[in-house]
Amino acid sequence: KLMKRNDWNMKPGEFHLTVIGIVQDLEGRFLVTRRNLDKEWAAGWWELPGGGVNAGEDSKDAIIREIKEEVGIDVSNAKGGHIYTYKNESPEEKNNYFVDVYNFVLDFKASDIKVQQEEVLEFNIATFEEIQNYEKEIGFLHYNSLKPAIDKIMKKQ
């Protein structure tokens, strides 16, 4: 079933698929972005690159596209892949979704990042401690849902 973009009028049992990319540099730091202040939802919060999966697209192609659109880097040949999926059910908001979480590790630096101006206020290549501080001070989108995936990554380092 196709749905209109941002049409959160889902019936029980209906879900849409979104993707999030945990992009890390070779030192294990995380590429994070801050949402523009004019966003209707979670304005100014920090987050990881990601978004919706388009009709006919698989989740890996979607996360590669979203990362390229939002921060201007190509992760198609990066080390890594799918590491985690979680489900969110919000019957009161009629917004149910699955999130496929990917982890990519590649050699990049701040000068390689070209943010999508309409979406992104700023970016950082952050340590996990910085991400924890963002969550406490400003807000970090999907932090609690992403914590198991980040913990899994941190154990490997």
Range-by-range predicted roles:
Residues R5-N6, R34, Y86:
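Short hydrophobic alpha-helix segments
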